[in-house]
Amino acid sequence: MSNGYRQTQGNRFSRSVDHDGAALDLEIDVLIPSYTDHLESNQPFGDLVVDAIPGLSTAIARRPTVVHVITTLTTGVELAYTVPLPEPISALCMKAYAYRWRFAERDALDIWRVLEVARKVGLTVADWPKGATGRATARILHTHFGTPAARGPAMATADKAMQTRIRALVLAVVPRSDT
């Protein structure tokens, strides 16, 4: 495979590089969109076996946020590169599904962070995707983050004021799923 990667699992490709005298393993997981509302592991896709991720279709369909990065490695080497990242709504769609199937604190915290970014860049309910994935994701976010009884905000932070802020951000950015 190009760039020295080798297939180590059905959807995982790895290569080792020397980093300041130590081996550093680089890994890439190949994913495909799931057109259901749940993670579908071990899906045949040509010669690969991959994971199908709900919400990924939204990220692929929307314009990415292009980030230009300049970083200095611990070796002193400077790297400059450009990477397309999911814009905030796409990230919220994927993270909402991740939270729903894992109920992990890190996913709750990520949702809060992305909600803050979405609000900061001026996104509103009018920007939300209109299709089935948008409606399903809105339902997940309102259920788990948009009400006082929802557990998501408490998993993201113990601060009650910030929990209230998270609920307010959901109301500001995510349309009600019943509309």
Question: Language-model segments: which ranges?
Answer:
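Compositionally biased terminal segments of proteins
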Residues: M1-T179
